[in-house]
Amino acid sequence: MGSLTRAEEEETAAAEEWSGEAVVYVNGVRRVLPDGLAHLTLLQYLRDIGLPGTKLGCGEGGCGACTVMVSCYDQTTKKTQHFAINACLAPLYSVEGMHIITVEGIGNRQRGLHPIQERLAMAHGSQCGFCTPGFVMSMYALLRSSEQPPTEEQIEDSLAGNLCRCTGYRPIIDAFRVFSKRDDLLYNNSSLKNADGRPICPSTGKPCSCGDQKDINGSESSLLTPTKSYSPCSYNEIDGNAYSEKELIFPPELQLRKVTSLKLNGFNGIRWYRPLKLKQVLHLKACYPNAKLIIGNSEVGVETKFKNAQYKVLISVTHVPELHTLKVKEDGIHIGSSVRLAQLQNFLRKVILERDSHEISSCEAILRQLKWFAGTQIRNVASVGGNICTASPISDLNPLWMATGATFEIIDVNNNIRTIPAKDFFLGYRKVDLKPDEILLSVILPWTRPFEFVKEFKQAHRREDDIALVNAGMRVYIRKVEGDWIISDVSIIYGGVAAVSHRASKTETFLTGKKWDYGLLDKTFDLLKEDVVLAENAPGGMVEFRSSLTLSFFFKFFLHVTHEMNIKGFWKDGLHATNLSAIQSFTRPVGVGTQCYELVRQGTAVGQPVVHTSAMLQVTGEAEYTDDTPTPPNTLHAALVLSTKAHARILSIDASLAKSSPGFAGLFLSKDVPGANHTGPVIHDEEVFASDVVTCVGQIVGLVVADTRDNAKAAANKVNIEYSELPAILSIEEAVKAGSFHPNSKRCLVKGNVEQCFLSGACDRIIEGKVQVGGQEHFYMEPQSTLVWPVDSGNEIHMISSTQAPQKHQKYVANVLGLPQSRVVCKTKRIGGGFGGKETRSAIFAAAASVAAYCLRQPVKLVLDRDIDMMTTGQRHSFLGKYKVGFTDDGKILALDLDVYNNGGHSHDLSLPVLERAMFHSDNVYDIPNVRVNGQVCFTNFPSNTAFRGFGGPQAMLIAENWIQHMATELKRSPEEIKELNFQSEGSVLHYGQLLQNCTIHSVWDELKVSCNFMEARKAVIDFNNNNRWRKRGIAMVPTKFGISFTTKFMNQAGALVQVYTDGTVLVTHGGVEMGQGLHTKVAQVAASSFNIPLSSIFISETSTDKVPNATPTAASASSDLYGAAVLDACQQIMARMEPVASRGNHKSFAELVLACYLERIDLSAHGFYITPDVGFDWVSGKGTPFYYFTYGAAFAEVEIDTLTGDFHTRTVDIVMDLGCSINPAIDIGQIEGGFIQGLGWAALEELKWGDDNHKWIRPGHLFTCGPGSYKIPSVNDIPLNFKVSLLKGVLNPKVIHSSKAVGEPPFFLGSAVLFAIKDAISAARAEEGHFDWFPLDSPATPERIRMACVDSITKKFASVYYRPKLSV
């Protein structure tokens, strides 16, 4: 690393005047950024100054929770620009001279909600609320940057960089849709006067009367003439009157202020430069050859955070005009290296409209590719040059620069400019032909010629905001020679198949000079197979799939060019109509959502679709989560020291470097635990700190505390552990083979006699098969977090935690510290999603933090980074099912013999209860006379897998639906026929002895068949498939039956505390946790209905172990049943006490009645309690009633797949569910939609990749998919185009409070309808090749599995017809 000598420093100071003054406006308030903060991100700064509405969800720009709007003034165009960015990646000093607007700045409950905030809240667009501020700000930035109301497509596109795990996106899209349907003026002016003409204060951005203003240089400056008047949006569906604030204008100071060159510093010797001229950049590069040039920091930010890269000198080139050129010239478009990708998009759109059509083929290809490049926030800051010089092998643009014949202009520190073809620029893995004293100056993109065609290709796990698995840029120039069209020039460049963007040189040579016709294809395919060779263990895996994509892309390119020639009249042999589907990219129309339910109650809070009680807090960023809690004085921050081996003996732990690290306050290991080091929710088989042997990667070995979070993480990384490795079990198959099972985890359920049935001859057919079900990451938006502090010098321990089970935190901490539970208090206000991932796994982090807090007598906060969270906390259990099914030729099921195994990981946790529920649900909704289900929990060297929405039920039902499909294939009948023929009915006896009561599956199924018009849908799909060779559609109907109750009897209990105050308001406390599912809202509705008072009179503050003791975790979908009933019990007690007073007087209000009762000394507080009756199961006898009742549902799905790439779209989803008489139909429908989309992710998108025998390119036991960059949950672009949800009408559930039913988990499995619709489409593709037999499709049905199952001449070059892509299970 170079460094400036004193002489060079003096020379630099003399040459240019560098300033150390950095000014930024935040929500209209002027702030001076002190020197020394170059290491901070904008997000850290915003939260440090008391603006916690902007959230840290991932830290890599992948989730959008940190979205803010940045406004800057362009001195060239004299216009203010507004755009959304990821604050988690933006260096603090990168926004110097800009105006930052956060969610707090646009509206709150005191000033009034902004129309965007209000609309989102009222449309039920917020559940857990952690992602909500990010969505608000993405929409706000779109409106502020729009000259006219945006289209619905633009709205959806603007949300591509925002993730939500709760809602399923439909209500968010519906909330924002209104902003595209009105022509009101949309906040796009930068006037210095407000609507009533009053001046705007430069320091606050709000109306004032401070008179004339002065600019930053002290000279008199009159206010600019306003070009437009402006006022907040006012739409029919929004109460605009509630919003009294005007939009924050761009601060005049920043508009008038002279921009200066900046030189600032940061922690650990970091230097930050912001030059204003190219010569300054070159001078700095001469002094610091290894300095990093940055624009958006989207790559460097990830490297420093997750790869521990250290760059001492950072040069921000955002203000260098020479690097920002965008010019149209005779030889093409000249693009400065610092041009942002969003700028390039807008420029290309304009160029395409203005230039001749034959010139713009390259422009169109790049523009189309940019649509799928990252999310909006990244494109707003990432630069052309940054993407080029990073030289990523999966860059979406580099193959196109190479294919289009682009050239790069490079300048050195002596102002010498050289030009190099893009195809020669990339030398190796992240290596380019750029010397340390050179920088990329610009890109020259040439115009295309007549009959020159350029096309882009990309296939990723997920379309939006995802890196490519394989991408390509292809170009061909053909000329007519003696009546034939001859290839004059061709470029074929692939990404994702080598260490650099890879040129298919043999293929290019062969094609040059050849006649353009179908005869090219076979030889071209053979040469491409030689040109692109992936080793068996190539990084990224999926070798067969990625190889097939190289041929598929060229085939698509050939057909594209041929079709273009044909429609222009230059090609006589046109494409057959069925082949056109290969070149037709799916154009996604705007989605539509429909919700159908009836309101059966009037005049009471129960049954009304009221908005989530925290919605207004969430949309304004005022809702407080654990990491938002103001920290007590002297709070220390913690970071974990984790195992890096799957199974190893610890030989030594060296903390010497950590102890000398800045801010270090302590390292805590197993020897420091005051109480018991072993813990667990059922069996205490897990150590808080590993003492001798580690049994998985990510196991906690120690905990470091320091004065800041960054210092704690830095110190933790310096702890060196020496290991002696031991053999590891890394899959279910390995565990079964080795007999590696958790103790006492074998279970068996028997009904009838399976063996006798198989041997009796009653079964006309017997099938056998194996189903692999992949795991799933919870991906709750709020990471695991806890704040622990001692009270009375450790006599008590209090904590605030993000958990579904405060009582478990209380127990764990008391056990670890050796304290009685009565001295440990855990409080939870709300959590940003849980889904089971915070039921047990969160407690061990609180326990670890409590050791440090107890020993040091100081508060300790622990917040996990997303990658640490994912690699340590466990996921949904992967399953292996082996089935044998006997049935008649008529399709009647006679016998099921099933062995199921789940991957428990390295400790017991909840794996046995998960297995048990899976076994209970192994029949789904089918009546089977003879059943034998054996199950066992596998011990593997992975983090302990844990509870996840459905708790094993979905995995077992997926196995059941697979053997149903297998039966249908054998019988050559539709799966829907077989399902309907075998439905359970009222009075059916299940395979664990429970009598089925109130069975509504027939009603649900029948209503769905009518709603989706199934027979017509089938005819339409057949017709489409007959006319399209390379795109296929498929449909499926899937039923579900989900048992409600904890299968462990004692957990079916609940407590609540209800306190009525003399003003008639009510404080309710219960043992359940609000995590977005609307539990507090429903409970409040129950209380309001009980007292017959407005819902606004009920308040629920938090969940606390010192208010309601021994609370059952918020899980099993039973919380509304349990805590609603407990609250009802408490309310009824109070009402019974009040009744004598009420009967004696005519009280005008509830408040008057309460006051009268108080004056008569009547107790206005009550503890309510409820137990679920008539449940329990005996595993010795194998009989019992594990469930109080069942929730039924069914879903129809229609999909369309691209058989050449594996890409798919969900066209239609129709859901019918029996929820009895809903307490809140809006919240319940939100749960159905969110659950379905989460289930869709599990079934078709989300794949965990572990270092196992199937993925040898990953280090053994390590999780590769440990962040949003590599693990893809559904995005806005993945939701169904037509999404309909209906609640079954006219049904009651007399067993439960207000005849309602549980909803959290039951809809999840319905997402598998998409998987089976995909399989239906694949079957149509296989039939084209003459393959009609059964084939397995493991979950998730990713593009890899879809493509490789659609066997054709291309896939057969790389794999057999029965190839089964590898899966971590």
Swiss-Prot record:
[2Fe-2S] cluster 2 binds at residues 128, 131, 164, 166. It catalyses: xanthine + NAD(+) + H2O = urate + NADH + H(+); hypoxanthine + NAD(+) + H2O = xanthine + NADH + H(+). The keyword NAD applies. InterPro entries: 2Fe-2S-bd (IPR002888), 2Fe-2S-bd_dom_sf (IPR036884), 2Fe-2S_ferredoxin-like_sf (IPR036010), 2Fe-2S_ferredoxin-type (IPR001041), 2Fe2S_fd_BS (IPR006058), Ald_Oxase/Xan_DH_a/b (IPR000674), Ald_Oxase/Xan_DH_a/b_sf (IPR036856), Ald_Oxase/xanthine_DH-like (IPR016208). Binds 2 [2Fe-2S] clusters. FAD binds at residues 293-300, 373, 383-387, 396, 440, 458. Mo-molybdopterin binds at residues 804, 835, 949, 1116. Residues 20-106 form the 2Fe-2S ferredoxin-type domain. One of its GO terms (molecular function) is iron ion binding. The active site is at residue 1305. Pfam families: Ald_Xan_dh_C, CO_deh_flav_C, FAD_binding_5, Fer2, Fer2_2, MoCoBD_1, MoCoBD_2. Keywords: 2Fe-2S, FAD, Flavoprotein, Iron, Iron-sulfur, Metal-binding, Molybdenum, NAD, Oxidoreductase. Residues 265-450 form the FAD-binding PCMH-type domain. Its EC number is 1.17.1.4. [2Fe-2S] cluster 1 binds at residues 58, 63, 66, 88. SUPFAM superfamilies: 2Fe-2S ferredoxin-like, CO dehydrogenase flavoprotein C-terminal domain-like, CO dehydrogenase ISP C-domain like, CO dehydrogenase molybdoprotein N-domain-like, FAD-binding/transporter-associated domain-like, Molybdenum cofactor-binding domain. Substrate binds at residues 839, 917, 951, 1047. Its cofactor is [2Fe-2S] cluster; FAD; Mo-molybdopterin. Belongs to the xanthine dehydrogenase family. Key enzyme involved in purine catabolism. Catalyzes the oxidation of hypoxanthine to xanthine and the oxidation of xanthine to urate. Homodimer. This is Xanthine dehydrogenase. It comes from Oryza sativa subsp. japonica (Rice).
